[in-house]
Regions:
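Short Asp/Glu-rich motifs
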Residues: 7-8, 106
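Non-heme Fe(II)/2-oxoglutarate
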Residues: 58-63, 89-94, 98-146
């Protein structure tokens, strides 16, 4: 569950889900289910339209609570239109595992909660080398925090 409490919910850095999942072929989707209404003020998910067409982008440590990675080249993202879908409780967003997305902090008096379910192609496999490199990156971040 993704929880952004009223007035204190933290931002989620821009990222691609498949950077975490490492699904070969990237045939994977996220279903984001709104548990209450969501808009720009309470930190709705935002999307960079068309960003999924460029494969997995370089990520780096974000050092953000609850999110370990972020897109490295933020200038690259400036070429895309950013969408801020407004949702009501029960609405569902479906996005591809390569689409760049994130969310801003919650500055409103309303909580923003969402539940996600991920699906992948039944023939999908995992990129074990990517997983190994990601684990190394996580270990470096942990060492820097100690």
């Amino acid at each position: 569950m993704f929880n952004k409490p009223a007035r204190i919910g933290l931002p989620s850095p821009d990222h691609q889900d498949n950077y975490y999942w490492a699904v070969k072929g990237s045939n994977a989707l996220t279903f984001w289910i709104a548990l209450n209404s969501s808009d720009k003020n309470n930190g709705c998910v935002h999307y960079y339209d068309g960003s999924h067409k460029f494969g997995i982008l370089e990520h780096e440590a974000s050092f953000a609570k609850g999110s370990s990675q972020k897109i490295s080249d933020t200038n690259f993202l400036k070429k895309f239109k950013t969408s801020y879908p407004k949702l009501e409780a029960g609405d569902v967003l479906i996005h591809h595992s390569l689409v760049v997305h994130g969310s801003s902090k919650n500055i409103s008096k309303n909580n923003r909660r969402g539940w996600t379910i991920q699906f992948k192609d039944k023939n999908a496999s995992y990129d074990l080398e990517h997983i190994k490199n990601y684990e190394k990156s996580l270990n470096k971040q942990i060492q820097l925090r100690v």
